[in-house]
Amino acid sequence: MQGLNVIWVFNPTADKVLICRRLKEPYKGLYNLVGGKIEPGEDNLSAAYRELYEETNITSNDIKLVHLMDFTYFLADSCRVEVYVGTLTRKVRVHGDENELIWHDVNENFFDMTKFAGEGNIGHIYEIIKINKI
């Protein structure tokens, strides 16, 4: 089963989340969390930090990630998606080659599937973050 990760990154004041606009399928043109594939034999948390750095230039010195939850999909292309969350410890200039990066207000409707990828999962993730006061 392929392992993937997505990472919810708050800015230092936790009023914005780092989102990318997908440039390719799946979800081309929609907003999504940053993340990617866990390589075979790779430690899961290390994979999250690696993907975060590759896609945003954020390092482990800038943020402490917490493993929040997992989604497991058993049908079709079975995969496990690990969800991490963290707040930047300082302002960081983000940039990446894979997708356009945008700071979105956390009061956005992340369940809006015309704007956000993941069939409502981004909204669900944020609700779990709020319940757990992360």
Predicted regions and their residues:
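Short hydrophobic alpha-helix segments
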Residues: 21, 69-71
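Conserved Nudix-box catalytic region and its N-terminal flanking loop in Nudix hydrolases
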Residues: 16-54
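Structured-RNA-binding interfaces characteristic of tRNA pseudouridine synthases
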Residues: 114
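Conserved N-terminal beta-strand and adjoining loop/helix that marks the start
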Residues: 1-17
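Active-site-adjacent beta-strand/loop module that shapes the phosphate/pyrophosphate-binding cleft
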Residues: 13, 71-96, 102-109, 117-133
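A short coil-to-beta-strand element that immediately follows conserved catalytic motifs
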Residues: 59-69
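Short connector loops at helix/strand junctions that flank enzyme active sites
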Residues: 2, 33, 60, 76-81
